[in-house]
Amino acid sequence: MSAAHRFEGGCHCGNLAYVFEGSAGLDVLGLRADQCSFCRAHKNRTTSDPKGTMRIYVREPSALSRYRFGLGITDFLICARCGVFIGALMEEGDKAWFTVNANTFRPPPADDFPVAPVDYDAEDIPARIARRKRNWTPVAEFKLGA
C-alpha cells in the first residue's frame, strides 16, 4: 500500500495510537458521520476499509476506557487520561474490526472534507455485525503496553 494511504494518529496525550493502512485514499473511502447520540456529541467523522489493516497501540492499558452502549456489541475506545475517542472496535473470537475516528489522524482531514451522514438505528444485532464485518477495517494488531 502506498504511503499516501497510510494514516497515523491517536489520542491527544499519546496513550492510544494507531496506524491505519487503506487500499485507497479518503477521496475513495469517504468519511461518515453516524447520527447516534454518542457520535453526534463527539462530532465524529469515521472511515474504514475492509481491504486495509489497522494496528492499535495502547501505552498504558489502565488508561484505556472501553465504552459500550446501544446493542452492546462494540467497544468505543476512549483515552481515560485525555478523553479522546479514537474509534470503535468489534471483536469476535480471535478476529476484530475497527472504524477509526478520522478527526484523530495526524493531520486530520480538512474541516470541509465531505461527510456522509449515516443512521444504523434500524439494524438488529445480526445485521449490524454483518455490515461491520463487510465494511470495517480488519485489526492486524492490538497491542497493550506498547
Located regions from the model:
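A short Gly-Trp-Pro
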Residues: 1-10, 15-146
